[in-house]
Amino acid sequence: MSKLNELGLAEARDALRAGETTSKDLTEACLTAIEEAGVLNAFVHHTADLALERAAAADARLAQGAAPAMCGLPIGMKDLFCTKGVASQAGSRILEGFLPEYESTVSQNLVDAGAVMLGKLNMDEFAMGSSNETSIYGDVINPWRRKDDEKPLTPGGSSGGSAAAVAADLCLAATGTDTGGSIRQPAAFTGTVGIKPTYGRCSRWGIVAFASSLDQAGPMTKSVRDAAIMLEAMSGHDPKDSTSADLAVPDFEAALSGDIRGKKIGIPKEYRMDGMPDEIEALWQTGIAMMKDAGAEIIDISLPHTKYALPAYYVIAPAEASSNLARYDGVRYGHRAKLDQGDGITEMYEKTRAEGFGPEVQRRVMVGTYVLSAGFYDAYYNRARKVRTLIKQDFETVFAQGVDAILTPATPSAAFGLGEMTDADPVAMYLNDIFTVTVNLAGLPGIAVPGGLDANGLPLGLQLIGRPWEEAELLNTAYALEQAVGFVAKPQKWW
């Protein structure tokens, strides 16, 4: 057996049930790996004592033979999920010292499934970013490096800590959230698997809100099978979230046959962007050929409103963020600015929010407030909502024609260097989401799967987009792609 922390969820689960290892051993192996990987800055709140306590409880359950799905499996939790009594800061100064009195539904579902939380993972502040450079905790460093180059690279964002931790084998899997690509883009940058389920599949209750009509939690794992196992544990109806779907959760793992013969895979012409790197185009063509070889039927499709997706997203998401983030005022919890004598409530709000929010969050709050203002509401926000409806209708039309899944690149490039894009126009950074935002706007499930390595030895990802509520079929298509790619590369340990 490989090192315990290098196992995936499925292998570790089988080893636990066969009595070949214990949750305590798995957890200790991960805690050691986390200690050795401090330079990656992936974990920001450590819960070693809690993890060992839960591991002991899991071992007791396993000994009785009544173990739930993820019993004894050590995972990381993105800092956006509220965890009872454990710091939950959303990567922001404004939530300094916040210890929730409650557990998010998704993290509670994982606890109920027997998972062992190792700690909280770094992320872009309030999930706003594509490179994990907006975090109050500092940058996360991608465990992958370019050939013969020691320059630190981004793991992507906003779930950069989750992606880096899974890629570096610091945990068996991790939770992420995806508002415009924040699970799929980091997964593509780190050679891991990340699925954003259909909007409403996982409860949003207890997850710090960015854009409520777009946010969705999902797993980041080492394989498609692991994603199926963890997504099932995370999912389920929650009466505390009005957008949570009252639907039965399928056995996602049982759907993984790898047989996609006769399935129709759509290839959208609008995703062939001007200036798309040759390596991304070649990766896409390879993916198409693999799907064909597996027996799928390839169909050219059109999603005509794709070019408006990014502008619409960057109106809707900041608008919802400006509304959601209005609650951080320094009154009830989190950071409160020191006030000068004579300062009133208005000065307290101003100073607290100026000190508590980083520049990217401030930028998006300003944009959001602007597009919601009386003079611009119709010109920007309402127009963006109409575009969103058209984007959704594009997908509905394609799926009505019998298309089962859509194959696209996950990102327009491999991981870039830290600092490379922070000095550029913010729009250049936003372009990282070009292949992923449509999926959030339409509320569809999307999964990123490793597709190979670029010339510099960095991972590149392919994205599959599925029909709403058909994650089981999407995971099976992704499983077939994963089998065809045969991606086994791991980052060389330098940390």
UniProtKB/Swiss-Prot annotation:
GO CC annotations, alphabetized: glutamyl-tRNA(Gln) amidotransferase complex
Superkingdom of origin organism: Bacteria
Residue ranges of the TM segments: none
Catalytic activity: L-glutamyl-tRNA(Gln) + L-glutamine + ATP + H2O = L-glutaminyl-tRNA(Gln) + L-glutamate + ADP + phosphate + H(+)
Function: Allows the formation of correctly charged Gln-tRNA(Gln) through the transamidation of misacylated Glu-tRNA(Gln) in organisms which lack glutaminyl-tRNA synthetase. The reaction takes place in the presence of glutamine and ATP through an activated gamma-phospho-Glu-tRNA(Gln).
Quaternary structure note: Heterotrimer of A, B and C subunits.
Name this protein carries in UniProt: Glutamyl-tRNA(Gln) amidotransferase subunit A
